[in-house]
Amino acid sequence: MVLVGLMHDMGKVLCLFGEPQWAVVGDTFPVGCPYSNKIVYPEFFKFNTDFSIPEYQTQYGIYEKGCGLRNVNMSWGHDEYVYQMLKDHLPEEGLYMLRYHSFYAWHRENEYEYLLDDHDREMLKWVRLFNPYDLYSKNPEPPNWNELRPYYEDLVAKYLPATLKF
């Protein structure tokens, strides 16, 4: 979980390369199915062209009930970017934490139950376990990087290749 904590917002580097903030940060959600009113600012979905596609507004949208989140397309953002970057290198529990830590409608509001399979329900505990370390967990005292650097270098070397593909 420590490596996930280090890497989870790495996808926000997209803002440094011209992506607008709205396309990188914020809650994530499934696409191709009805939007939950538990997603932050749900009133703006009416301006999304997907909102007018009838198939997306059916009970399950383009998905089958219980299809599993691994078969669901999520909105694009920093979570999906870092997940794609690290998906071949981390244990599955960490990958769930990375990919779904901003999917609050699921892990905090219990929405989208119809998409889940048993494996997603098992992995939910890991996403919830990680959540307190995501939001509002900043320490006003900066850590001593010289003391921490060897620990993090060893951790990164254990799981990640010398070069990551962004």
At which residue positions do the language-model features occur?
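C-terminal helix/juxtamembrane-tail motif
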Residues: 149-166
